[in-house]
């Protein structure tokens, strides 16, 4: 084993993967790989692969290795991690082969899902591997003292999962992980445009709509202007132009937002019950 370690932290996300070196974000790329169908070799990773989605090319297929916050395609995930590490800026590259990785995982991951993350990272070059639950990493990243006795609650809406956790003394006091998040919002928008405007749109277009006019409330003080969306009529394939408002998007996201609200309330309910038990045990002592 090498005497030196190249240390990197990876936020392995459903939508985007972030790599941190020496406390600095050095890569933030879409979690997408493009693979040549003939020999299964890697064509592109991240931003270079993302535009190839939904192109219908026969010789190249695009894969999102993670789904709902967990690895859905082991080989593609390994290729993505290797490809992203190879993309690190020269100042963060070295001749060292030994890599120490810290990787985020959803708090609701099963043992099998965690094993898949470990295997994928080790195949991608990790010699030392540490896993941290995503809400804990989010709290640390926000500068919260997770070791403090005062509790804090984190609600982290990612691409594949929404992570909810109450943290105190470096531990989860209560937590929830639901597979309703950014990708679900995108699918809601795709379904809405199909159903309401008879328009067929891609996932990247839905992502742009979400970012430009996405909202969880029907009334906003600083409301965004309507967004002009261009896409084919699903029946005739002729081009359509539709102005989409934030109120429309808020309406089509209502059910998913309600599921997140319910999950937050469940976590708060468990937190309150746990606090009552803790208080009772303290009184009993």
Residue ranges of model-derived segments:
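Nucleotide/phosphate-binding catalytic cleft detector across ATP-hydrolyzing
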Residues: 1-157, 165-284
């Amino acid at each position: 084993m090498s005497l030196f370690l190249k240390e990197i932290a990876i936020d392995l996300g459903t939508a985007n993967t972030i790599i941190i070196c020496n406390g600095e974000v050095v890569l933030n790329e879409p979690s997408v790989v493009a693979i040549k169908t003939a020999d299964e070799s890697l064509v592109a990773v991240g931003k270079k692969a993302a535009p190839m989605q939904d192109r219908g090319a026969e010789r190249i297929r695009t894969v999102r290795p993670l789904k709902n916050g967990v690895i859905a395609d082991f080989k593609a995930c390994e290729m993505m991690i290797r490809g992203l590490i190879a993309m690190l800026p020269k100042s963060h590259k070295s001749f060292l082969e030994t890599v120490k990785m810290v990787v985020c995982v959803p708090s609701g991951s099963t043992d099998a899902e965690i094993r898949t993350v470990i295997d994928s990272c080790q195949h991608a070059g990790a010699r030392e591997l540490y896993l941290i639950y995503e809400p804990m990493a989010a709290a640390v990243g926000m500068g919260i003292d997770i070791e403090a006795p005062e509790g804090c609650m984190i609600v982290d809406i990612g691409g594949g999962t929404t992570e909810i956790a109450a943290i105190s003394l470096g531990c989860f006091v209560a937590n929830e992980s639901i597979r309703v998040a950014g990708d679900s919002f995108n699918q809601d928008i795709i379904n809405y445009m199909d159903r309401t405007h008879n328009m067929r749109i891609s996932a990247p277009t839905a992502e742009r709509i979400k970012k430009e006019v996405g909202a969880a409330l029907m009334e906003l003080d600083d409301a965004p202007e309507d967004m002009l969306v261009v896409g084919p009529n699903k029946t005739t394939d002729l081009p359509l132009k539709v102005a989409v408002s934030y109120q429309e998007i808020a309406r089509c996201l209502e059910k998913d937002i309600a599921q997140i609200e319910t999950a937050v309330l469940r976590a708060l309910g468990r937190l309150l019950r746990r606090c009552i038990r803790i208080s009772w045990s303290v009184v009993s002592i």
